[in-house]
Amino acid sequence: MRIENIGFIGLGAMGSVMAPLLGKSGYNVLGYDIGSKIEKSTGVSQVQSLNDLKNMDVIIFMLPNSKIVAQVINELLDINTKSILIDMSSSDPRETKQLGKTLQDKGINFLDAPVSGGVSRAKTGNLMIMAGGKLEHIKIVKNLLSVMGKVQFAGPLGSGHAIKALNNYVSAAGLIASFEALATARSFGIEPENFLKIINGATGKNNTTEVKLDKFVVSEKFNSGFALDLMVKDVSIANSLVKDLTTKNPLSKSVSHYLSKTLEELGGNPDHTEVYKVLLKN
């Protein structure tokens, strides 16, 4: 199957930088978003109706949650049953599997391929893409997805969304631990520069200590581009997945609860690195 025409639904923080990569790589990309706009100079032609996407080879979704993805797909089914559908959002894997069964009955190929790496890596096409679904279908779209990052096969449909949520839970746990450690180290007179050199040269290093602390926290910029409410959503999904497996989920439960309460305390739409502010205040 030759893939030329791509529909990209969701042109927010991530979609607005992912879709242009496809356009600049030679694909005919039509973008759709009810709230965001994108310039044609990016290589993406924005359309005003889902009807304009009826002849696409592939339709990609980069939307806030599973329910919105399902709503949009239900609207698309009235006009298009030929495209390969790829949900690159951070969706609930259980809802992805359920939606997949419905689409399979209609003969529609559906894949989940969420991403990790944030806006900075999205801009350079260096995302980690976690692909779930039938391997033969993933092979069809692998070259397309590879424009946006490294494609790693996760397993059957829903596995991509599962590992995305679990990855963000592990990342969030490391973030909270790193923030606590930095604040405590400072109380002992340890300068942030020395803290980072020691931790990153020892066994405690993680993505937060290697990437986020100096750039977004110590600098007090708090502008990583990943909103706290999205982290709360992902960790909540992960916590519920762990809970489905075992009632012994003390850490995922604690991380999920702490982040939810912190989001309430901060108010507005804070960056996830602003969790450090609340930790210091308390």
Segments predicted by a language model, with ranges:
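Rossmann-fold NAD(P) dinucleotide-binding segment
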Residues: 50-108
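Interdomain hinge/lid region at the active-site interface
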Residues: 157, 211-272
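Hydrophobic beta-strand scaffold residues
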Residues: 29, 46, 109-111, 152, ...
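Rossmann-fold dinucleotide-binding core
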Residues: 63, 90-169
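NAD(P)+-binding Rossmann beta1-loop-alpha1 motif at the extreme N-terminus of oxidoreductases
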Residues: 1-54, 58-61, 152
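Beta-strand segments within the central parallel beta-sheet cores of soluble alpha/beta enzyme folds
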Residues: 193-201, 253-257
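Active-site-proximal catalytic alpha-helix in oxidoreductases
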Residues: 124-131, 157-188, 200-212, 230-233
